[in-house]
Amino acid sequence: MIIDRLPSSLKNMLTYAVSIFLVKGISLIMLPIMAQFLSPAQLGKLELLATTTVFLSLLVGLAMHENLYRFVGELKCKVEQFNKVSELYTYAVMLSLMVGSIVTIVLFLLPPLQSVFTALDIALLCTVLGFESALGISMAWLRFKDRASSFLVISVVSTVFQVSAILIVLYIAPVVTYIYAVGVLTGLLQLVILHKTNGFTWSWGGMRNLKKLLMYSFPLMLSTLVAFGLTGAEKWIIGYSFSIETLGLYAVAAKFALAMCILIQPFSMWWMPKRFNALLYQGKEYTARVTQCGFVYIAILAISAASVSQLFITWALPSDYFPAVELLTGVIVVALFKELSDLFNIGILQQKKTQLLLVINVVCTLGGLGLCLTLSSYGIWGIIGSIAFAQGSRAAILLYFSQRLVKLPFQFTALLLILVNTLGCLALGFIYTHPVWLILITLFGAIFNLAIAYRYEFLSVFNLPRFSSDLQRTVRGS
């Protein structure tokens, strides 16, 4: 079979695709069902709770998983790799418990927070803070070792548990707190399974080693927190400036942008842990070509997600959620630029210039939030437009400085053609919403981007099997 002849990298990406769709796509899978039981206001509160959890998890986690990509990834000896990641895992658990305890005390002492969330909500949130960093390192280690099949099994088990529990909650007591609790329990289940699967040993590498790791990851954590202002904080602004119902509609649109990001993750999960190793041992040409393939993949997904999402909302959700269609194009553009920022940010991280990354994120985030305040009088589109502009600026600035530090041989003419075509298709999809037009726009956009990639030989890096030769052999054999 042709699939058996695919490179192992592509096989792993396909396996990761299924795994990530199961783990992170569950919210989208369950959306039609949840929309029948929950109002936009309830979905808005659930989104607010999830957003706060993500922010605090970033704070408490100290970006310790980034050390795996940077330091473990450069080691050749497998024993050294395992010893290093065991030290990293131990550090992550201890730091999460220490910092998480402090954050927990602060949260329970904040009266404004208690007016929005219940005490049980806060307790569940604090539970997540204690294990999220260790969970991230455990999952990253499986990807680093290319144990895609183990990753898939864990994903299936956790998804079955989560879906079953959510359905029970929806039919018995459709309360936001209980739905959130299911997610927390699922995370704990994953951590237990992963701890046994990876077999990490408790290993303390000393304060000097910890200081070295934190010097690298702490600026990244700050940078990520600042960047959160463009990838999550807008939900706080929407909930405060407009209404919790409006936030619920925005959350529905954002779930489809998340779906696009989920479909990008198989490539990211395969490539991100290996990019520095590839740059070091396989060269700039290989690194640039793989990155360009990722760009094409992201662009095609953006066009497809914008069209499919419009059809899904109008066909599968109650009429109360139809206004979310008008927000789809904006949130897809935001997600597009955010993913491109992560994809092209190679040189800055490779040269360990995390302070520079922090400065860039601070400038772009402050500019974006300033625009949000200035343009909020134009409604929710003023906020979406501000975030999209800030994300696009951030992507361009990161690419510029990354190239100055490590100049990769990107084919910028081809990349610009693909970007212009992608943004044009997204604009057309916003104007022409009839299903036939959406399908035609999607097909044209995908074919054009693939044609450019073929013309500039982006895909040659993967050594794909020659399907035409397979077809000829099949015909001769018959």
Indicate where each model-derived feature is located.
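Helix-loop junctions and terminal segments of transmembrane helices
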Residues: 60-77, 257-295, 345-350
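Alpha-helical transmembrane segments of multi-pass membrane transport and lipid-handling proteins
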Residues: 66, 87-115, 124, 167-171, ...
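Transmembrane helical elements of multi-pass membrane transporters/channels
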Residues: 12-27, 158, 178-194, 207-276, ...
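Signature of the first transmembrane helix
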Residues: 8-65, 163, 218-244, 442-446
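Interhelical loop/hinge segments that connect adjacent transmembrane helices in multipass membrane
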Residues: 1-5, 9, 149, 153, ...
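Membrane-proximal transmembrane or re-entrant/amphipathic helices at the cytosolic face
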Residues: 2-3, 429-478
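Membrane-interface junctions at transmembrane-helix termini in multi-pass inner-membrane proteins
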Residues: 131-153, 332-363, 402-404
